[in-house]
UniProtKB/Swiss-Prot annotation:
Keywords: Amino-acid biosynthesis, Aromatic amino acid biosynthesis, Decarboxylase, Lyase, Tryptophan biosynthesis. This is Indole-3-glycerol phosphate synthase. The gene is trpC. NCBIfam families: PRK00278.1-3. Pfam families: IGPS. It catalyses: 1-(2-carboxyphenylamino)-1-deoxy-D-ribulose 5-phosphate + H(+) = (1S,2R)-1-C-(indol-3-yl)glycerol 3-phosphate + CO2 + H2O.
């Protein structure tokens, strides 16, 4: 069983055990009307749009430094991030919906609920906690699930980042007419990353979609490797959580877009 399969099985058990219904009942509703649109930011931004992530750990990383997360959000906002991603998985990533709810009020930037969504109830909880965007991972969903969850999220006025790991999944994302597509550079079987995976997947990409490269981006040299793939932005977590000088580091990553 892969790590991803294990996580999905865990999410299924949480759904069956009433975890998400309890969250829906106990979390206060946070209004997201003041949140900016990430897609609008991409359209207006001549440089790469940055989704800056808040994370405490992952299945492959357990030594991330502890940060004042309110300050981290403020720094992301101040130094050029266009959106914030917040992990809400507790067991594998050390996040929570309570954390999302506490931090989303600290910024007007779009906030992405980064989780493993397989049921509309999870979308309801994400929105109630104050997310304005959600992640849908093509690899863990059937075509019907992907379409239904995508359409449901859009109906709730949420933006949707549809994540793909190979060209076949990219075609599946096109079928639901996903406007915002994340290309994950992580090998799902071995959980190792290669940023140039983005170049391979986007070699014959379609226009009228926006592409975000995710995972394995540690510095400006990594960004330069994939700049000519035609990406519109980056999702970066570990490198930002480790960085002690975001005022210099974050702007370095916001390179001018190269459109083919």
């Amino acid at each position: 069983m892969t790590i991803l399969s294990e996580i999905v099985k865990y999410k299924q058990s949480l759904l069956q055990n009433g975890y998400y219904q309890d969250k829906l009942n106990t979390l206060k509703s946070v209004k997201i009307q003041n949140k900016k649109s990430f897609i609008n930011a991409i359209e207006k931004e001549p440089k790469l749009a940055i989704i800056a992530e808040i994370k405490s750990k992952s299945p492959t990383v357990n030594d991330l430094p502890e940060r004042d997360l309110s300050q981290q959000i403020s720094d992301y906002d101040q130094y050029g991030a266009n959106a914030v991603s917040i992990l809400t998985d507790e067991k594998y990533f050390g996040g929570s919906f309570e954390r999302l709810q506490a931090l989303t009020t600290k910024t007007t930037l779009p906030v992405l609920c980064k989780d493993f969504i397989i049921d509309p109830l999870q979308i309801d909880v994400a929105k109630q906690a104050g997310a304005s965007m959600i992640l849908l991972i093509v690899n863990i969903l059937s075509d019907k699930q992907l379409k239904d969850l995508y359409n449901y999220a859009i109906s709730q006025n949420l933006e949707v980042l549809v994540e793909v790991h190979d060209r076949h999944e990219l075609e599946r994302a096109y079928k639901v007419n996903a406007k915002l597509i994340g290309v994950n550079n992580r090998d799902l079987k071995r959980f190792v990353t290669n940023v140039e995976h983005t170049n391979t997947i986007l070699e014959n990409k379609k226009t009228n979609h926006y592409y975000i490269s995710e995972s394995g981006i540690h510095d400006a040299s990594d960004v330069r490797k994939i700049l000519h793939s035609g990406i519109d932005g980056l999702l970066i977590g570990e490198a930002l959580m480790r960085c002690d000088n975001l005022s210099e580091f974050l702007p370095q990553l916001k390179m001018q877009k190269v459109k083919s």
